[in-house]
Structure formats: C-alpha cells, structure tokens
Amino acid sequence: QTPFYFSMSVSDVFSTILTGATFYIIPKMYFSFPVKLIEFLEEKKVNTIYWVPSALCILANLGALTTDNLKNLKKVLFAGEVMPTKQLNMWMDKVDAMYANLYGPTETVDICTYYIVNRRLSNDESVPIGKPCDNCDVLIVKEDNTLAQDGEAGELLVRGSFLASGY
C-alpha cells in the first residue's frame, strides 16, 4: 500500500474512484500475519491488488497461498521493485488472476511501461518491463546517444507529458 504522501497513491485512489470500486486500507500489521492478510482480502472480496513485490513475496514464501483462497482476486499488479520470478510463479500456480509488471522511475510520477505476464517464466528469467503506456515513449540509446537496435544494451529514456518538472 502506498502512503498517501507518495505520488503513486494518486493512481491508487483515483483509479478506484473512476471504476466505482471500493478502496480498502489494509492494516499494516496484517503484512506480518499472512493468514490475517488473506482473511482480510477474502472478507472484503478484494479483486485487485497493486503491491510492491516484497509484499507479494511474503505471502508466497510463507506458504500462505492455496488454490482455495483469494478466489475473488482477478488482478495482481506489482511495481517499485524487481519481482522475483520464483515467487511470481508461486502466485501464478495458486491464484488464477491477471498479473502485470508495472514500471516507472520516480521522475515519471507513475508507471511508463507495463507487461502482462501471459506465461510461466523460468526461475532464472527476468520479468520484462514491457511496452510503453499511452502518452509515453520509451527509447533505448547507446553510449554514443544513437538508438539501440533490438537486443542491444543501452540507457532507457522516457518521454511524455507525465514527466516531473525538470526531466
């Protein structure tokens, strides 16, 4: 859960309002008690979560996920950290939902790319950051400031109207 003083809370709050959904604030202590956290999600019939991967990993690593719980959960969105593939696969094995990796550095104020996870990834594979969001352009440039070709390494540059002032 994003603190309200952090820019990411804007998308949490307003996307909930826009879709006519209910916004629940999960008591922070529940993240220390996975069974209580799952009970809360089930009791409230939560259908979408947008968490940092470390929160998702807590439930996966402690074996709190089963094929019998979280039946209402339809979307699992994650951002802010690298999602370990092993734990992502643990989620995908137990919870039938749409999974999406959302990427956006601080200067974009929100996400700039997304990847819908549509297959099981091998444990040594990285979760891709995906495609640019609407109103966003993503470029990869080499050290000589020329555009990188597919498969070439380089620096990720983002442009769009949502960049923070000064970028």
Feature annotation, model-predicted:
Residues 31-36, 53-66, 75-98, 135:
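Short gly/Ser/Thr-rich phosphate-binding loop of adenylate-forming enzymes
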Residues 3-47, 119:
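Conserved AMP-binding/adenylation subdomain of ANL enzymes
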Residues 16, 20, 48-49, 59, ...:
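A generic "structured core" feature
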